[in-house]
């Protein structure tokens, strides 16, 4: 990321178009120091903590609430194909993250990578656009976990699902009229906001304490997943799981558009294997820890997702998941699976475990994303206040509190309306740039110190690029989300140029 506090890269490389190799190599060193000296952060995260932080970020409430959406998109249990292809895409993308994270173990992840790969000029601009889109997408991602938590609590207390106020806010988007955004207020909204506030309070501690607590959260996440998987497998019906409707795999236009929509949702659920990259300055022996954490977390979560979805589809008719049998099954599918097998009390226990899982994801998201504004501020590419570090806990406390506050506000939104737009924005302004970037960096700086080199190069980034492009263009009405992403790009570009002109920076100065 552009500014992880490495001023020598920004200054010494201006006239070359690329950072000097000596500066880049320093990023790949497996420093043993307990403190990342130019950032004031403590390297206190080992491999177990890194894996648990990645996994609780990846799983969250997503697979428990999006399974019906994938089944609806693909019109049957062939939805498992979306999860399989999603796992392949996550693995290819994860290998790219592993190489970049091991070579540049700094706070902020993608911000640092884009800044370094594309040089002090284009890199500074692209990394600013990344920060700009993250200002929207990060709080929305965190808020989605909070809303999902409140949704599952509604299985225990249905009053939480009441809506006292709703409003449809049309957001103008050039060429596609409007992007609908639903604002909802009810008891569940307050619960979602409280979830975000509690997570921020628990993160307001040193990184060693935060990592230890993440291990405890990981145990609850595994409990929720295994409870549903084992229940489904013990009450499994092959006819339900593999009762494909006629023409399920006919290679028609409907099949490919449904697969694109399903793959988009699966990609959303696999997000998070890169969480440890945002915490690179706080990882011990990052050249080994970061790649291992990514590979292990992607592999374990892929297996869990496939088992979870197969077991659910083998116990509940897929027609129920598409809305033909009421909202309770769709909104609380994991709890319903266990309730039908072992009774109401067992279902309530699983609902609480899913709530635990949702909170774990919010905890991990807040932790990782709070390091990105901090990294940008260190590089003088964001508000300087976010560069502050708590004098005792050694954490970027201002960035953490800001992100938590904005996320609480976004809890009033019905976030399902924006999931597709958020995925498209991330693909255009982060994932595709990194897939291309890892190949650019191989060509421009072949001597760069790479503690981990992605396997089967260049196949993983090429497969990931193909998968992301398929998600972008295969779905009906895809132009709406793409134009929305372009609006984000245009507004970010205007702000960047205004700042650059005032500061006499590129393209208006040195």
Give the location of each predicted region.
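C-terminal membrane-solvent junction of multi-pass transporters and transport-like membrane proteins
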Residues: 184-187, 199, 385-394, 431-481, ...
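Membrane-interface "cap" regions at the ends of multi-pass membrane proteins
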Residues: 16-77, 91, 95, 106, ...
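Hydrophobic alpha-helical segments and their helix-loop junctions in multi-pass secondary transporters
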Residues: 150-159, 219-248, 267, 310-316, ...
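Hydrophobic transmembrane alpha-helices that form the core helical bundles
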Residues: 69, 82, 91-196, 201-204, ...
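Hydrophobic, membrane-embedded alpha-helices of multi-pass small-molecule transporters
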Residues: 45, 49-64, 69, 191-198, ...
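TM-loop-TM module centered on a large, flexible mid-protein loop between adjacent transmembrane helices
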Residues: 112-123, 155-165, 246-250, 262-263, ...
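Membrane-interface loop-to-helix entry segments
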Residues: 153, 187-241, 253, 271, ...
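Alpha-helical transmembrane segments of multipass membrane proteins
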Residues: 200-201, 229, 309-311, 355, ...
């Amino acid at each position: 990321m552009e500014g992880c506090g490495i001023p020598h890269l920004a200054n010494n490389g201006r006239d070359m178009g690329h950072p000097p190799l000596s500066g880049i190599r320093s990023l790949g060193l497996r420093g043993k120091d307990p403190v990342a000296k130019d950032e004031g952060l403590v390297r206190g995260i080992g491999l177990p903590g890194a894996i648990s932080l990645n996994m609780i970020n990846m799983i969250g409430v997503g697979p428990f609430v999006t399974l019906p959406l994938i089944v609806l998109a693909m019109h049957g249990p062939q939805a498992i194909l979306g999860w399989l292809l999603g796992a392949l895409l996550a693995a290819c993308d994860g290998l790219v993250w592993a190489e970049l994270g091991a070579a540049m173990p700094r706070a902020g992840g993608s911000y640092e990578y884009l800044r370094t790969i594309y040089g002090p000029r284009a890199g500074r601009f692209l990394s600013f656009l990344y920060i700009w889109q993250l200002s929207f997408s990060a709080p929305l991602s965190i808020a989605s976990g909070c809303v999902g938590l409140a949704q599952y609590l509604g299985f225990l207390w249905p009053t939480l699902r009441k809506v006292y106020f709703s409003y449809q806010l049309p957001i103008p988007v050039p060429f596609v009229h409007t992007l609908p955004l639903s604002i909802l207020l009810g008891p569940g909204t307050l619960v979602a906001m409280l979830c975000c506030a509690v997570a921020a309070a628990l993160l307001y501690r040193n990184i060693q304490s935060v990592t230890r607590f993440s291990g405890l959260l990981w145990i609850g996440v595994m409990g929720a997943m295994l409870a549903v998987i084992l229940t489904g497998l013990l009450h499994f019906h092959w006819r339900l799981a593999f009762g494909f409707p006629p023409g399920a795999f006919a290679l028609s236009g409907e099949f490919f558009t449904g697969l694109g929509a399903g793959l988009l949702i699966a990609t959303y659920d696999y997000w998070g294997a890169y969480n440890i990259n945002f915490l690179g300055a706080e990882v011990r022996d990052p050249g080994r820890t970061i790649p291992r954490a990514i590979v292990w977390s992607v592999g374990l979560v892929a297996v869990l997702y496939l088992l979870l979805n197969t077991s659910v589809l083998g116990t509940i008719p897929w027609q129920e998941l598409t809305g033909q049998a009421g909202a309770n099954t769709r909104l609380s599918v994991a709890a319903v699976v266990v309730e039908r097998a072992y009774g109401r009390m067992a279902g309530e226990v699983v609902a609480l475990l899913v709530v635990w899982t949702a909170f774990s994801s919010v905890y991990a998201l807040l932790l990782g994303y709070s390091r990105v504004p901090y990294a940008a501020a260190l590089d003088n590419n964001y508000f300087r206040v976010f560069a502050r570090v708590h004098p005792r806990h050694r954490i970027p406390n201002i960035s953490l509190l800001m992100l938590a506050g904005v996320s609480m506000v976004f809890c009033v939104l019905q976030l399902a309306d924006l999931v597709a737009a958020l995925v498209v924005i991330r693909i255009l302004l982060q994932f595709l740039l990194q897939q291309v970037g890892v190949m650019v960096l191989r060509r421009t700086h072949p001597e760069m110190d790479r503690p981990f080199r992605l396997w089967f190069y260049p196949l993983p980034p090429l497969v990931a690029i193909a998968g992301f492009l398929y998600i972008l263009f295969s779905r009906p009405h895809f132009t709406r989300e793409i134009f929305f992403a372009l609006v984000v790009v245009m507004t970010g570009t205007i702000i960047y140029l205004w700042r650059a002109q005032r500061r006499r920076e590129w393209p208006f100065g040195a």
